[in-house]
């Protein structure tokens, strides 16, 4: 397909953006197959901007334009806008509950491909789309790759999406889980007075458990609390992760 190879692209003039673009473009180039991928999940965050951009370039290429139309499923307001801005067809998870492939970013990735997500407050919809996908691909710059356990590089805690009326109880219950160092409601300051509100009109709590010995077990423990909608621990469903560097190179982690 007639898209410019990554190696031939000029620098964006920002090393971090070059890294994000490299990871995203490489992930799309190596995994998106128009012959079998029609429904595509588009995640949230600053790195996924380049995923939508690359898929948009493929969709606009003469080889694909008249033959295949990707249907892109957003994980929130931002990704919905990315889909539209790149000339892609917008779908919904209600219309297409089975997603062929999904691309999303991460706040931290451990050596076992477990993730912490939710720094951008879209974690429930991100998990809905990623777990509905036959193949889930993670894109990030190299800072997000942790050589050790989750919670080593990302030190802001595990994001927990909660029903607004339950946040006080959930805060109390989180403090009762062994290993919880702190738990606090995420505030929107300085841009917004009051708490951060998710696209689902829920609130977010950030719960610090330090480095996580068993991410799946902690997710299950938190998810069982009354009032919890979802956690930002993504354990076991990512197939591959791409990490971009400032020089345009990428590293890959796969199951």
From Swiss-Prot:
What pathway is this protein a component of? Carbohydrate degradation; pentose phosphate pathway; D-ribose 5-phosphate from D-ribulose 5-phosphate (non-oxidative stage): step 1/1
Broad EC category: isomerase
Q: Which domain of life is it from?
A: Eukaryota
Instruction: Work out whether the entry's keyword set contains Metal-binding.
Output: no
EC number(s) reported in the record: 5.3.1.6
- Gene3D superfamilies cross-referenced by the UniProt entry: 3.30.70.260, 3.40.50.1360
Catalysis: reaction(s): aldehydo-D-ribose 5-phosphate = D-ribulose 5-phosphate
Q: Where in the cell is it found?
A: Cytoplasm
Gene Ontology terms, MF aspect: ribose-5-phosphate isomerase activity
Query: What cellular component GO annotations does this protein have?
Result: cytoplasm
GO terms for biological process? Answer: D-ribose metabolic process; pentose-phosphate shunt, non-oxidative branch; pyridoxine biosynthetic process
Q: Which UniProt keywords apply?
A: Cytoplasm, Isomerase
**Family annotation (InterPro entries):** NagB/RpiA_transferase-like, Ribose5P_isomerase_type_A
Q: Which NCBIfam families match?
A: rpiA
* Family of this protein: Belongs to the ribose 5-phosphate isomerase family.
Q: What is this protein called?
A: Ribose-5-phosphate isomerase
Q: What is the lineage of its organism?
A: Eukaryota, Fungi, Dikarya, Ascomycota, Saccharomycotina
